[in-house]
Amino acid sequence: MRPLLALLLLGLASGSPPLDDNKIPSLCPGQPGLPGTPGHHGSQGLPGRDGRDGRDGAPGAPGEKGEGGRPGLPGPRGEPGPRGEAGPVGAIGPAGECSVPPRSAFSAKRSESRVPPPADTPLPFDRVLLNEQGHYDATTGKFTCQVPGVYYFAVHATVYRASLQFDLVKNGQSIASFFQFFGGWPKPASLSGGAMVRLEPEDQVWVQVGVGDYIGIYASIKTDSTFSGFLVYSDWHSSPVFA
């Protein structure tokens, strides 16, 4: 009987889990044991939350002055400003020179002659009455324009011994024609004519008798034949001073 009981107790002891001495209640506690050895490092934990924003720091000291930048593009033009006040009246300037308008005039007559002139050629009026500017040539009987503008020319002719027809000619082209019949009267007759014409520098004007028998221009002591012309107005806006 005893051997059987001993085997039973031995089996129970081997099949039960070992008991921790520290967990067995005891009426008389013992002294604390020695500290155990440190354990191994554990795995890294989860990241923590962001911390709160800190307070603004104090302003820093001013930095050094930087280099100047490139000039910018010109801006748009501004609106005109208000009109300023009138300035003081200036001093009176020196007196200027009076300008003289351009001049051109002449008058000439034929010398006494009883010989008829040739036809279709310039008729000279060789005795100059006025030619201050020298624009008329008494040798050729031609007027040469020096001042551009409008001119008036006139011819007063004595008609005797034959009928007379003459032209005012500009550069070889007739600009006006005049005629006087002579009927064998005992005294001379007269023929006058004139015209206005625009001339440019170097244009020429003269008198020319007609063809055939119409060459009865005459001159004597008491019966003159004259050719005259003068500038009516100039085309120059700013004319120089002419003597």
From Swiss-Prot:
Domain Collagen-like: 30-95
InterPro entries attached to this UniProt entry: C1q_dom, Collagen, Collagen/C1q_domain, Tumour_necrosis_fac-like_dom
Signal peptide coordinates: 1-15
Annotated keywords: Collagen, Secreted, Signal
Record's keyword annotation contains Secreted: yes
Region (Disordered): 15-124
Annotated C1q domain residues: 99-238
Gene Ontology molecular function: any one: identical protein binding
Subcellular location(s) of the protein: Secreted
Keyword Magnesium included in the entry's annotation: no
Swiss-Prot/TrEMBL GO biological process terms: inner ear development; protein secretion
GO cellular component, one term: lateral plasma membrane
The protein's assembly and partners: Homotrimer (via collagen-like domain). May form higher order oligomers by supercoiling of the trimers. May interact with ERFE.
Name of the protein in question: Complement C1q tumor necrosis factor-related protein 5
